[in-house]
């Protein structure tokens, strides 16, 4: 039977559809086959590596920081090991009630309230979101064993060995060595911290901060194979990278000088500071501030009360380094600058005579000597010896419109950055006509510059503001004959084997032209002030076997008792070191600061002073 004509197109269409469907099926199978072949053959290695990585855990191994040593090798800062309790917050239960329960239990184990646990998490996540949270350091082994036995209950909790700074002598040179702490979010953005991770520790102050790149080591990596539950498998330790310890930093600090200075300040029990420096090369042999603090306080969490006592106490303020960050009038120790300005500008010569009748009168106001004494006719050397205020008032009056005091203060380093390698310094202030007249024009003071301002400045009073380090630079420049040293505390870097791998070089900042005759006259006056009766410090240094040049100072501070100062260059006449001591509310310079300076010089020269009877002088 032959098909009807109408059936032929219908069968053709059906065959076409079957052919199309068959082609599509073949194409789909071809795509599927190619994809399987691609996964298993071409990308097989890639997915095998990913599968292996899913069975491997990497843990950063923190590197110990280098030690900080005194110049003789005495350890000022080292490390100790500690066990830290870490929490991965992404492993906490998603259910709020279960999360609260786990955090409460963790807090109980770590002796922390739930509130404190949450605050710790919040504060650390603000710095580095996603990083493990350090709940507590110095946890005991009993807690470690308990967590190992109950790992399923605390899947996000681990214990890691960390290195914590240790200070063998407590607060010794605290402001110099500084502190360390976890890197902040802002610091992570800085180029100098490239490659670091949240939770890493870096120097935050002192040499720990300035020389962090030497002290900070390189973290290592430990790789461990884990099972499907994320638990370590037996024998699962894989190839690891050991951490590289940091290098040791050797300071210029002389331990005996440092200890003597700190003990002298502590004995007085009043806020103060000292600086002892090699004037030839700028090496800081000792520098301290009182009250001080133990840097170990930064190695563990602080209470708000502890933090406030350290930072916000308006009187003690232990965190402030009074040697570099203070701002005081210096009293009669400034007379050295006045003398040099007058000599170098031809206002007087060493043999010029000024009559001291006990006071000068200016605009109806009398400026008197301390104690109301009068010394009669004086040249420069005896004027320095007895610290005649009238002599220097007269010099200030003669120079009041010349800007000589301001120029020489600046040349010698007052109210000028010293270049100290510790960073923070108070700027200081040398009052001038321009400064006060601008304040007056802006309505910030009641009067413009006057002769009385310069008269006050000539004796280190009035609006003068400086710190012990700046005064040390000024005296050093006089002692060297004009070379301005760069003060520094870093000497060299050693590797772990004690080999010197870097020596620091600090070149002089500038040279000031000082006439040798001017220098000689001033040093002679300072020598007689310190060791020849009736010098103002002869009762303190008269029995010291090393000849020195020194000057007492008594500064008036509104709202405070007099501040005590002493500045010394030793040995005289060719000094190697300078020592500056100041004690707030310490009274006359010979009462507090001078005896403290004597203790420092006795330690440096390893010689003791004998008691002397001296009428001495007043300021």
Task: For the regions a language model picked out, list residue spans one by one.
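Periplasmic/cell-envelope proteins involved in peptidoglycan metabolism and beta-lactam response
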Residues: 1-304, 327, 349, 403-413, ...
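Beta-lactam-recognizing serine transpeptidase/beta-lactamase-like catalytic domain environment
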Residues: 2-5, 77, 227-240, 280-333, ...
């Amino acid at each position: 039977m032959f098909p009807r004509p109408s059936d032929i197109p219908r069968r053709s269409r059906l065959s076409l559809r079957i052919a199309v469907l068959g082609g599509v099926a073949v194409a789909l199978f071809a795509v599927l086959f190619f994809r399987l072949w691609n996964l298993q053959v071409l990308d097989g290695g890639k997915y095998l590596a990913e599968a292996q990585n899913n069975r491997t855990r990497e843990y950063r191994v923190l590197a110990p920081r280098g030690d900080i040593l005194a110049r003789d090798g005495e350890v000022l800062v080292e490390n100790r090991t500690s066990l830290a309790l870490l929490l991965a917050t992404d492993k906490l239960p998603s259910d709020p009630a279960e999360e609260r329960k786990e955090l409460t239990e963790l807090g109980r184990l770590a002796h922390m309230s739930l509130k404190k646990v949450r605050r710790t998490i919040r504060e650390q996540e603000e710095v580095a979101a996603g990083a493990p949270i350090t709940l507590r350091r110095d946890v005991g082994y009993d807690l470690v064993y308990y967590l190992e036995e109950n790992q399923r209950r605390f899947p996000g909790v681990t214990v890691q060995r960390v290195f914590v700074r240790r200070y063998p002598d407590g607060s010794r040179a605290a402001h110099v060595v500084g502190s360390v702490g976890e890197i902040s979010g802002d610091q992570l953005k800085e180029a100098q911290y490239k490659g670091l991770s949240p939770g890493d520790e870096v120097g935050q102050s002192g040499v720990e901060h300035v020389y962090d790149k030497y002290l900070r080591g390189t973290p290592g990596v430990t790789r461990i194979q884990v099972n499907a539950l994320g638990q370590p498998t037996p024998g699962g330790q894989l190839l690891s990278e050991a951490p590289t310890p940091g290098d040791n930093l050797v300071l210029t600090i002389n331990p005996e000088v440092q200890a003597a200075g700190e003990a002298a300040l502590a004995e007085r029990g009043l806020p103060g500071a000292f600086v002892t420096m090699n004037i030839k090369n700028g090496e800081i042999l000792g520098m301290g501030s009182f009250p001080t603090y133990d840097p170990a306080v930064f190695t563990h969490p602080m209470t708000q009360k502890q933090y406030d006592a350290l930072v916000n106490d308006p009187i003690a303020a232990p965190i402030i380094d009074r040697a570099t960050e203070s701002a005081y009038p210096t009293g009669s120790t400034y007379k050295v600058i006045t003398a040099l300005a007058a000599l170098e500008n031809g206002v007087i010569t060493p043999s010029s005579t000024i009559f001291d009748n006990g006071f000068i009168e200016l605009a109806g106001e009398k400026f008197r000597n301390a104690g109301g004494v009068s010394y009669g006719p004086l040249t420069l050397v005896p004027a320095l010896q007895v610290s005649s205020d009238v002599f220097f008032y007269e010099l200030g009056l003669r120079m009041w419109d010349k800007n000589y005091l301001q120029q020489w203060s600046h040349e010698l380093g007052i109210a000028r950055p010293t270049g100290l390698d510790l960073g923070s310094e108070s700027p200081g202030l040398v009052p001038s006509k321009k400064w006060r007249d601008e304040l007056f024009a802006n309505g910030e003071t009641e009067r413009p510059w006057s002769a009385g301002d310069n008269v006050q400045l000539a004796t280190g009073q009035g609006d003068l503001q400086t710190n012990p380090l700046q005064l040390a630079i000024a005296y050093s420049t006089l002692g060297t004959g004009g070379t301005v040293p760069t003060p520094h505390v870093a000497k060299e870097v050693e590797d772990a084997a004690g080999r010197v791998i870097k020596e620091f070089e600090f070149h002089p900042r500038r040279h000031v032209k000082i006439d040798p005759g001017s220098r000689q006259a001033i040093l002679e006056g300072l020598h007689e002030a310190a060791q020849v009766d009736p010098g103002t410090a002869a009762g303190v240094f008269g029995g010291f076997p090393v000849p020195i040049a020194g000057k007492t100072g008594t500064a008036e501070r509104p709202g405070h008792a007099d501040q005590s100062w002493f500045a010394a260059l030793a040995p005289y006449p060719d000094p190697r070191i300078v020592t500056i001591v100041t004690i707030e509310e310490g009274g006359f310079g010979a009462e507090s600061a001078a005896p403290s300076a004597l203790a420092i010089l006795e330690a440096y020269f390893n010689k003791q002073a004998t008691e002397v009877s001296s009428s001495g002088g007043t300021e």
